[in-house]
Amino acid sequence: MRHQYYQPQPMYYQPQPQPIYIQQGPPPPRNDCCCCCNCGDCCSAIANVLCCLCLIDLCCSCAGGM
């Protein structure tokens, strides 16, 4: 009777693709709570994180943003 040693499989990090939301009608306004996230770090880092999480309703004016 052979001993079978458990060998853990290597964990490969596979980034999950961002879900693509198909919205009907006009695009959402630029001043939604996640606008900071959409146009990058256009405010302070902490404000940008809070804005990305929609914890605060903060819109930043981004010059040449998406």
Curated annotation (Swiss-Prot):
What lineage is on file?
Eukaryota, Fungi, Dikarya, Ascomycota, Saccharomycotina
One GO cellular component term of this record is: cytoplasm
Under what name is this protein listed?
Answer: Uncharacterized protein YBR056W-A
The organism encoding this protein is Saccharomyces cerevisiae (strain ATCC 204508 / S288c)
